[in-house]
Amino acid sequence: MAEYVLTATKTEARAGSFYDRIARLYDFTFKINGYGRSLDQYFDEHPLPVFPGARVLDAGCGTGTLTLAMLRNLQVPVKLTALDLSASSMATAKKYVSKQKHSEQKVEFMQGNILSLPFADESFDLIVTSGVLEYVPLDEGFGELARLITPGGYFLNLPMRPTIATRFLELLFRFKAHPPAELSETTNRHFKVVSHYHFPRFQIIGWSKTAVLGKKI
């Protein structure tokens, strides 16, 4: 059985300390690999299923790559919350968001544990996450996120897929990609899959990730 950095039996302080230590490396990696441009293209081709005033959560925002991509591409004003366990990562994300030009969107930052999120049931119309569920047991992570989504709401997950590139990233960032069959079964148990997007192989994000949009029934 995989040993995850963050589980229900490990303290937030211990897990948060790990993320704080890797924040700069994590941020540098995303700066040079073109993930932001790939996300812009994805959101241009697949607009987020939101309406004016929708409540959106970036669960595990890290240094803000996905949050910033949403700010660049959202066409309507939403209530956006960005949450992460690492204070250092969130500080970096806040800095980048503050420099975002011509954005009418407001972002609320919160520190929290993805396995025990500080929100009531059905608090969000859309939750997005990337590179987070690989740090936690799949059932626990999915269950907690599904709890927060309204019936008819959406969940956008950018999971890691098993590749040589993913294996290198596993060693670098101490996560564990979930087996595709287990990921598919767990996704279908909580959501109806609307789309499963494969990033182009010539984009670095395509070496390790896909994008799965699910709807909570």
Residue positions per predicted region:
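A short glycine-rich, Lys/Arg-flanked "PGG" loop and its adjoining helix->strand segment in the class I
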Residues: 140-151
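A conserved beta-strand element that flanks and buttresses the S-adenosyl-L-methionine
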Residues: 128
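Short catalytic micro-motifs in class I SAM-dependent methyltransferases
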Residues: 131-132
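Conserved beta-strand signature within the Rossmann-like core of class I S-adenosyl-L-methionine
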Residues: 152-160
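Class I SAM-dependent methyltransferase SAM/SAH-binding core
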Residues: 57, 63-115
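Short alpha-helix
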Residues: 175-190
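Conserved class I S-adenosyl-L-methionine
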Residues: 1-50, 65, 69
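Short conserved loop adjoining the S-adenosyl-L-methionine
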Residues: 116-121
